Amino acid sequence: MIVYDKFWETMKRCGESTYTLINRYNISSGTIDRIRKGQGITTAKLDDFCQIFHCRVEDLITYVEPADGEPHSPYSEKIPK
């Protein structure tokens, strides 16, 4: 599962806000809402944020293994181990 905790820290460290992302950089409020809810965003949006914040992807997101009993991606069964 991807978590966005570092996104908020990086945004604050760079002196940006959701207001500036929406109004200065034309990031949609829907994208901000998806991040806030922990939902997926495109790699193109991650690239946009890396350019805005002058950072690397790992400064925005972290992969966390799902706990036992938590639903996995429907694609996980198709990935060879």
Specify the residue positions occupied by each region the protein language model found.
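Short alpha-helical DNA-recognition segment
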Residues: 15-33
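A short, Lys/Arg-rich alpha-helix, primarily the initiator
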Residues: 1-20
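Residues within the helices of the helix-turn-helix
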Residues: 8, 19, 33, 47, ...
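Alpha-helical residues within the helix-turn-helix
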Residues: 12, 23, 51
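Short, charged recognition helix plus adjacent turn
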Residues: 9, 62-81
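Short, basic-rich loop-to-helix N-cap that marks the start of a DNA-contacting helix
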Residues: 39-51
